[in-house]
Amino acid sequence: IDEIKAYLAQPDIYRPFILCEYAHAMGNSVGGLKDYWDVFESEPMAQGGCIWDWVDQSFREVDSDGRWYWSYGGDYGPEGVPSFGSFCCNGLVNAVREPHPHLFAVKKVYQYIKSRLIDNENLTVTVKNWYDFTDLKNYTLHWNVTADNGNILAQGEVITACAPHETVEIVLGKVKLPRDVKEAYLNLSWTPNQASAFMDTNYEVAYDQFVLLANSKYEAKIDLPSGTKLERDGYTWFN
């Protein structure tokens, strides 16, 4: 990433920076995509890159006990012949196109609708439309505030216009948290208004979740060992 930034800092560049393979989707992988995309989205000359690869290159075989399994490089060839072991199983989906868990991480980073919470009390978000040709009025925002006990405290739907590559501010309003709520979450989900060949109107194209400030009147009961001091630093973990 530092090398990308160094290239982009040159005053005389005229070609975009494209990474032919910036992530390898083998096993528990693709966890660092957001760091790259922070650069791609902030630097016009950073065009993007390619993930290796889309699908596991494997075959369905049956063992001597009649059980099927996905085979890969190490299952073939005479004994003693070098192979790359499981190297061929490096896709975002398996051989029959069923998603691996890390495909959902890719979808989250790649989503074209990205939100940011800017007001915790009178719930307000800014929404960036990263589509090149599609207005946000073609999608519906479904939102809710859910307490840590699972109860939905408020919910609604919003359709708003926002041209490609523009940002819009959406005010959802104040939501009163019950006294026994320690933490609440603002959940945002976007779905298309019209079905297409690739998705129906229930398909989630983008989502975000934000942790809201805990109810200041709620005091957690904490049993501390004798001589232990509890310090409150106001730190809140959020996504």
What are these regions (language model features)?
Residues 116, 126, 157-161, 171-173, ...:
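Generic structural detector for well-ordered beta-strands
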Residues 1-126, 130-137, 142-152:
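Extended substrate-binding grooves/exosites of carbohydrate-active enzymes
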Residues 130, 149-151, 175, 227-235:
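C-terminal regulatory/interaction regions
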Residues 186-193, 206, 238-239:
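N-terminal accessory beta-strand-rich subdomains and adjacent acidic, glycine-rich linkers
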Residues 192, 215-239:
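Beta-strand-rich N-terminal accessory domains
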Residues 140-142, 146-184, 190-193, 198:
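Intrinsically disordered, low-complexity Pro/Gly/Ser/Thr-rich segments with frequent PxxP/GP/PP motifs
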Residues 195-223:
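Short beta-strand elements
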Residues 126, 142-144, 187-189, 229, ...:
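Residue-level detector of beta-strand face positions
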